[in-house]
């Protein structure tokens, strides 16, 4: 059986990992074995955090809405419940934007939820 030399294949595989590890500190960006470990961990973290980002932003929006709602004399849960009863279909992202950028507009939304 003929001998198979994997020069190009192996080099390309290593260079792909080292390209992904560019910018990593110290040997994590230059040595293949440590770079491979760091890249694997970085890709795992990226995968996890793409899902976590959605949760984190929702928590941020709820905290902002709650703070603005309490300034208008109503809790977050009562505000959301009132909006559902009043059939005001506005999502939490837009409510948070209203609370931060247009407090007077947010007051009208709170008034609609109270009635």
Curated annotation (Swiss-Prot):
Q: Which SUPFAM superfamilies match?
A: Ribosomal protein L20 (SSF74731)
- InterPro entries, A to Z: Ribosomal_bL20 (IPR005813), RIBOSOMAL_L20_CS (IPR049946), Ribosomal_protein_bL20_C (IPR035566)
| GO CC annotation | ribonucleoprotein complex; ribosome
Q: Which CDD domains match?
A: Ribosomal_L20
Q: Which Pfam families match?
A: Ribosomal_L20
| GO MF terms, alphabetically ordered | rRNA binding; structural constituent of ribosome
Give GO terms for biological process: ribosomal large subunit assembly; translation
State the source organism's domain of life: Bacteria
Keywords, alphabetical: Ribonucleoprotein, Ribosomal protein, RNA-binding, rRNA-binding
Stored PANTHER family? 39S RIBOSOMAL PROTEIN L20
Name the family. Answer: Belongs to the bacterial ribosomal protein bL20 family.
What is the role of the protein in this entry? Answer: Binds directly to 23S ribosomal RNA and is necessary for the in vitro assembly process of the 50S ribosomal subunit. It is not involved in the protein synthesizing functions of that subunit.
Q: What name does this protein carry?
A: Large ribosomal subunit protein bL20
- In which organism is this protein found? Synechococcus sp. (strain RCC307)
Instruction: Write the lineage as a comma-separated list.
Output: Bacteria, Bacillati, Cyanobacteriota, Cyanophyceae, Synechococcales
Gene encoding it?
rplT
